[in-house]
Amino acid sequence: MRTAFIASLFALGAGMTLAAPVSSKAEADVEARGNRGAHITWYGGHMLDDPYCGGTRPTDGDLVAATPWDSPYGCGDKIHFDYWGKQVTVTVVDKCDTCSGTWFDISKGAFSRLASLDVGELHHVDFWRV
């Protein structure tokens, strides 16, 4: 009797696993949204001159970012930042010489969507590729 009960539980668990497969896209979404701890500063003015990715010089109001040289995010990639419910999506147009790891420089326009420019820098910001 005990063996039959254990076998029934095993069969039930296997059936539940097969009934609710997780797509690779869903797994990728969870992984993509799992990035935490970004350090964000803002840049603008002449620092926007001659962006690494080329193209038109961005303005302070454009929603753009500079990434560390070792970042997996490259030219044209879009990164979404979420800071205490305030959100912005930026396009990578530049590299940041003083940034490393998960430190990003974003334009004044992008930063101001997350916090006041007077704050200067943000820590523990969630981010993911979009």
Predicted stretch roles:
Residues 2-11, 15-130:
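Secreted/periplasmic proteins
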